[in-house]
Amino acid sequence: HTLGFEPVITEREIKGYSINRVWRAVKRECLYLWANGYVTDVAEFDRGWMTEWHSNIGPFKLMDLIGLQTIYNIENSYYAASGDERDKPPAKLKEMIDAGHLGMKTGQGFYSGYDTEAGNLDVGKK
């Protein structure tokens, strides 16, 4: 509890365990919607998410916080394990990473304008 996490028992081992698998489904769908042009304003999407789910952060900003290279690596590990093309991270995400847009770490990701020294979550504009 000291780290702010709540333990969740998973009865059998599964890649990603339980909470991370649900988060993965959210990430995967958000990335799909964004990469295929269904969501073009990630800030608007995040605001809708936060309102709907009573959350203090949306999935796109959370991916920026985690780091887009980390997100890509995690998604790619699922793809490597399954071989299913639906698990492959979108090329558009790789293009962002190759351009040096890694999220909060570099000040540019889905959002821009992060204070990379302070790590302030409230900063960052689409």
Report the location of each language-model feature.
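NAD(P)-dependent Rossmann-like dehydrogenase/reductase catalytic/cofactor-binding core
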Residues: 1-20, 24-126
